[in-house]
Swiss-Prot record:
Entry annotated with the keyword S-adenosyl-L-methionine: no
Summary of the function given for this chain in its UniProt record: Structural component of the gap junctions that specifically coordinates left-right asymmetry in the developing nervous system. Acts by forming gap junction network linking embryonic neurons and providing electrical coupling between cells, leading to promote or inhibit AWC signaling.
GO terms for MF: gap junction channel activity; gap junction hemi-channel activity
Annotated GO biological process: cell differentiation; monoatomic ion transmembrane transport; nervous system development
Protein location: Cell membrane; Cell junction, Gap junction
Family, as annotated: Belongs to the pannexin family.
The name this protein goes by in its record: Innexin-19
Residue ranges crossing the lipid bilayer per the database entry: 33-53, 103-123, 199-219, 285-305
Topology with respect to the bilayer: Multi-pass membrane protein
Transcription regulation listed as a keyword: no
PROSITE patterns, A to Z: PANNEXIN
Gene it is expressed from: inx-19
Organism: Caenorhabditis briggsae
Gene Ontology cellular-component terms listed: gap junction; plasma membrane
Amino acid sequence: MFFHATLARSFISALSVRGDDDAVDRLNYYYTPLILAVCCLVISAKQYGGTPIECWVNPHSRESMEEYIESYCWIQNTYWIPMYENVPDDHTAREEKQIGYYQWVPFILIAEALMFSLPCIFWRLCSFQSGLNIQTLINAACDAQALLDYSDRQKAVEAITCNFVDNLDLQSPNGRIRARGWIARIKFSRFLSGQCISIVYSFTKLLYSVNVVAQFFILNACLKSSEFVFFGFQVLSDIWAGRPWTETGHFPRVTLCDFEVRYLANLNRYTVQCALLINIINEKVFAFLWCWYMILAIITTCSFIYWIANSFIHSEKVDYVMKFIQIAESSEYKKLQKFEKDATVERLYTVIAFAPHLLDSFVSDFLKSDGILMLRMISNHAGDMIVVQLVRNLWQEYRERNWREFEEHEEMKDVEMRRIQGTRERIVIANPGQTKSFL
């Protein structure tokens, strides 16, 4: 018992909320299993602590016989025949109308909760095996965001930057070293270099979407319904319109049960009428779950498409990084304006050198898809201000590593600025009277 309790606590702690995911992931692996656990608890309380079924027997029968019949009918399944139809004499026809799901509802809900947790377990195992410390980075970023002192925050961001760069370098190993195992070859292949964890996370998103859709098949298979997803809408429509179960047959409350009694070497068959009280709760629970699964399927699918676009479309990645670079550049320019009164509109003193081809190389060759993924994770949990400082430091790191290209760009920029300045001087000389208006 102690081992099972420890195992359960370990499983729950392993699925606790962490920083290496988003809100949609938490709806799937954390909040949905909680909802299913509550539903399972409510149904189990009625099923094992209350009276899930009551059967009408001969008033002259003993109480022990009544308890036996109710236990037998609960275990052996019951069947539903509309009140306006005759009960068929053929026992095979009765078996075809059997209702055999009500005993297994708690176990079905537990299985569904485990299925919602599987993609999360897959993601965390792969994230751990990849070597990227995404969770550590996000926790450090959240701690840095909480710091009020500017110098302490800067030191924390610099430490995060060093760790971030180490993670990026880990995803781009030296190509001259040949990997021996086939797993290492796949992980360090040129195609997957820098985007391995992004592919894994996108695949995890796909697993969440597939799992939600699979729940409709599972529920209908358990309820033996051929109406697929519209069965849930039909149940909701019946509840809303006030149509009784006696007309629809959805989650019937009154069913029939056949049992046999051996008496004096003879086998006597009896039919009793039973009230399935548990189906009152089952109807409300499954109707709610259908609504929740439909909403969750839409949200999860949209989230999957969103992450696919932002992780693998180059223009989206460039625009995302450019936003933070422009914010950092604007912030530095405003700081310079406080001390440099002659700072011109052309931003001659700009700290972050900007060039389109260098930005493309920064995104595709330095950050890559995995770096963009980590930046988005940090932004989701620690806020954009930390990401602005982090991107600024990463840009400076990239600038130091590619100083030759930046020097060439600065030289071209100086030549262009001298040409513009010379043009202005010629304009002033040609129109000396206009200079008075600027004095």
